[in-house]
Amino acid sequence: MTAPAGFLPRVGRLIAVALTAVFLLAPTGAEAASRIKDLADFEGVRDNILVGYGLVVGLKGTGDKLDDVTFTKESLIGMLERLGVNTREGKLDPDNVAAVMVTGTLPPFARQGSRIDVTISALGTAKSLAGGTLMVTPLIGADGEVYAVAQGQAQIGGYAVQGQSASVQKGVPTSGRIPNGALVEAEVPFNLSAMESVKISLRNPDFTTARRIAQAINAFLGTELARPLDPGTVLVAVTAGYEGNAVALLTDIEQLLVEPDTVARVVIDEATGTIVIGEKVRINTVAIAQGNLTIRVTETPQVSQPAPFSQGGQTAVVPRTNIQVDEGKDNKLTVVNGGVNLQDLVNSLNALGVGPRDMISILQAIKSAGAMQAEIQVM
């Protein structure tokens, strides 16, 4: 799907992030509908966060400095002593060990013996985890119980190289992943077949969308078994035909098509100059003028030296400052008629010849003037 010819000729990043190729050709009816599984989650069917503390060994001189990071040293001593190695009598100062936090996500219905990915992140002064191996690390859940055990070779996406007078770094060498690095040891108890009702949690709570989901489910089942509890929750009773077989009910429900209702919203990321304008954004009639003021200050100091063989002369640096002020072109007022759609709004702003960052200020000013019927969300 492509944008209309001549659309957004100069706005740069706004071309990609305004999503105009989708919003301007706004679909209707079934084309705008989404599956319930893409709009909501079933309560209880969720991931669980796991975390653990471990040691990465086998680093090439890029590990923690044990004199500075005492918890790494104590952890190493404890691990070696559990393996029967006496370390108390000698000096222990390796540079190939690093303490790390290990995190992972236990997916719903993960069974004992299955594997999950884990992420490792350095805690101490380690410069890189490249080439390291994570030693056996228990991963605990929010209840303090161990659900998985992690171990394996770390995959690092970055690197760091340092010499006596220069260094080069790419990516984040102190963080990495271990694919299938954790073995599930305990399952999260969840009896799906015994459920008498199912709660559907909307990812973007909305009264209208919740009501439409309930209506779609009732129309499919042929009876009033679904009702919205609030903008983010729809309760569905397990009907007689699905008793003891909630999996079949959830499978049928998640495939139903519902057209979600969205809030008119403009999302702005001032740090990157990113603007995302929703399809439903409308504005009242407003006149806009935008002026650019650029001030350039350039320092070009000159060195003044005394004449040859002169007495008492000294070399001096004479400052020289050049200031240029560019007020830009005299932009006239641009009138934006009320009730325009996204294309008309962006085209009117483009007529001012401004970039994304200036457009952020303009959109905020339109909102302050009460002419924009939309919510502005600043990231």
UniProtKB/Swiss-Prot annotation:
Keyword Signal part of the UniProt annotation: yes
InterPro entries xref list: Flag_FlgI
Annotated Gene Ontology cellular component terms: bacterial-type flagellum basal body, distal rod, P ring; outer membrane-bounded periplasmic space
Subcellular location: Periplasm; Bacterial flagellum basal body
Alphabetically ordered keywords of this record: Bacterial flagellum, Periplasm, Signal
The keyword Signal belongs to this UniProt entry's keyword annotation: yes
Signal peptide: 1-32
Principal cellular location given in the protein's record: periplasm
Record GO biological process: bacterial-type flagellum-dependent cell motility
Gene Ontology molecular function, alphabetical: structural molecule activity
Oligomeric form and interacting partners: The basal body constitutes a major portion of the flagellar organelle and consists of four rings (L,P,S, and M) mounted on a central rod.
NCBIfam families to which the protein is assigned, alphabetical: PRK05303.1 (NF003676)
Function: Assembles around the rod to form the L-ring and probably protects the motor/basal body from shearing forces during rotation.
Family: Belongs to the FlgI family.
Stored PANTHER family: FLAGELLAR P-RING PERIPLASMIC PROTEIN FLGI, FLAGELLAR P-RING PROTEIN
Protein name, UniProt field: Flagellar P-ring protein
Species: Rhodospirillum rubrum (strain ATCC 11170 / ATH 1.1.1 / DSM 467 / LMG 4362 / NCIMB 8255 / S1)
Gene: flgI
